[in-house]
Amino acid sequence: MKFRLTVLIVFSLCLSNVFADEGMWLLGNLRKNKQTDRVMKELGLQMPVNKIYNPKKPSLSDAVVSFGGFCSGVVVSEDGLVFTNHHCGFSSIQQHSSVEHDYLKDGFFARSLDEELPNPELYVRFLLRTEDVTKRVLSAARYAKTETERRVAVDSIMNVIGLEVSEKDSTLTGIVDAYYAGNEFWLSVYRDYNDVRLVFAPPSSVGKFGWDTDNWVWPRHTGDFSVFRIYANTKNGPADYSPDNVPYRPEYVAPISLDGYKEGSFCMTLGYPGSTERYLSSYGIEEMMNGINQAMIDVRGVKQAVWKLEMDRRPDIRIKYASKYDESSNYWKNSIGTNKAIKHLKVLEKKRAAEAALRDWIQSHPEEREKLIRLFSSLELSYSNRRETNRALAYFGESFINGPELVQFALEILNFDFEAEEKLVITRMKKLLEKYDNLDLSIDKEVFAAMLKEYQLKVDKKYLPAMYEKIDTLYNGNIQAYVDSLYATSNITSPKGLKRFLERDTTYNLIEDPAVSLSLDLIVKYYEMNQSISEASEQIEQGERLFNAAMRRMYADRNFYPDANSTMRLSFGTVGGYTPFDGATYDYYTTVKGIFEKVKEHAGDIDFAVQPELLSLLSSGDFGRYANAQGDMNVCFISNNDITGGNSGSAMFNAKGELLGLAFDGNWEAMSSDIVFEPDLQRCIGVDVRYMLFIMEKYGKAGNLVQELKIAR
């Protein structure tokens, strides 16, 4: 059978790495990846790849950390200072804030080590080495007859390999991750540091300038950075928080460039991108759009409206709910943009054309046809069989598991290990009780009632958990009356009640509480729904793995990078602007001039409110060594580096491995980037390190911190 040439060209563009700036590359095989090495040098890289990652010698990657497991960061001083985004440190800043000490609004500046603030929930993770363990993992699954048996075997050996690392050295953590839809497996060895203290945070008028309005948008003028410090024991090893700990002495300190960049300058990011679905089938993309994305859009929109109303009315609620609102709205807007971009950029049409080309290739190769003859029909049928239930599960998760905090408390209680070591029980109880500090019961009640209504409106009645029957029979269908009664009778609506409740001994007492009983009903329904589609889900898991492998065989000469999975990756490209639509061109950087323009344009909008003293400082033009060649102050810049969620706080380096800034966002026109790379549109937005240092030194009067930094000469 002859290939359809035009379709095959689309396949090449859609599913293979043909763009120099596309890809989130594994560090472990950088030296073997001659094609990537060549392209980086052609774009301007001026350092050998073994200076980027080298498990045997200090290298650039040793300065890069996973920040809390949800962001990235970079070590910039011999005393363990870490730069990350303001929105990455936002939760920590919020937890230390109060109406009297509003660090969110005013910023926080530690003048000495003694003033630096501990964050018990926070850690940083250093990557020490990676190792390909594919043969060992697949060998353990060679006798598996079903997808379930394969998964159990694979998960077991992955866990064993990881445990072997910590058994040899208790300060290390070994994690095996799957790549290429489960066709390859790599071990990553990490060392975690759990004493991480807040050192510097600019006011939100800098770190969150533009807030939701500007989120995912270019041009941008947000100084999205914060500064933390890693602490270690006296032997420079990991340690829990202690006043006796000392600043960590790093293996490698990232040098900082004050020379800036120009159009076409080489730029690379190192960080921990969360997840992408670049090789997902069109059936999976369609499910994502109509399932989890639409559920986030609908449910979070309702929940956030309840929160925002009270946040705008009360300063204490603004502080309490700032972090959770920020996290929720970030992915809410992301889902809106993703669905819009999928349609606008015709992503589904491109994927379907690519799949048609793969079908032709399979048909033209007898050995492939024998193995994969039913691949696409099986995928299509399996996705169809779980479509309705999977969509309901997405709404279920958003409405209940990520919805009212009373339910989240109850679910934690059900998972509470009362038989654990006493010290662990006390620690976990303390953490659970602390969550009440950021809860307002009247708001949570309103959220719960809204979630119950939204879920009922969006799914078939067969997906309603048992509490809806109770609402109908005992409360005449009055959801608000049910919620009022629930919150009035549950013991776990206050820290005191929860503590008293947790100190009881028997499981019988646990389920007596109406909120815990309700959560049990939710678990039962959630399990029932998942079980009903388990067979289809297994078929999809297998089908997507075979699809991925077939695609790589079809283009065996191409350089395929694996999807992001929260492991360290390198991305590279160049600094440059773009054309978002006909008649418009965006430059590759912004300056403080744009701050004044936006303040004027959005007069009265708190998203763009800036302290008069900061405006005065910026208008003075006294930028010193941080000014660009024209004497102005750059704020943000863009490159075509390939990033996603989790890359927030990633170091953006120049060709010499010197820090230019921190990645913090993507752009609205390419919000489908987790699914397909759009070379003409996709941009990584970064905050310029010179603006960061200017704010630290001139506004925050933190010259002592700037003195710690390694400025490249």
State the predicted function of each range:
Residues 1-22:
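Bacterial Sec-dependent N-terminal signal peptides
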Residues 17-713:
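Terminal presequence/propeptide segments associated with secretion/organelle targeting
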